């Protein structure tokens, strides 16, 4: 069983990060193009494995915690869905069979808890090396 104090500390930390990022102009997308960091791609990919269509709240939380604009998050998910569909079509055409590809169950508008997003960020393999 998880220590409730650790959960409360994680929520408090996520809240402080959200407050800080809300005051940044970079959150509003006023800066130029920036490449996504490894940790941003890692977290976005893990969320994409859970749901290809995250809810508005999930996109907002990701944007704040990853220091990206909500629109950038939305575009990333659109592009990832497109790549995923292309890979599925390519796989079906390689099989050369007229069989119908099994449809994946799509979970739409799933809200991923902030605790899980924070845990993903903190559990990133080289998180301990960030800032060194």
Swiss-Prot record:
SMART domains, alphabetized: HOX
Keyword DNA-binding on entry: yes
Keyword entries, A-Z: DNA-binding, Homeobox, Nucleus
InterPro entries reported in the protein's UniProt record: HD, Homeobox_CS, Homeobox_DNA-bind_prot, Homeodomain-like_sf
GO biological process per UniProt: cell differentiation
Region of interest called Disordered, as start-end residue ranges on this chain: 82-101
Protein's name according to its UniProt entry: Homeobox protein HD-4
Organism, scientific name: Encephalitozoon cuniculi (strain GB-M1) (Microsporidian parasite)
Designated gene of the protein: HD-4
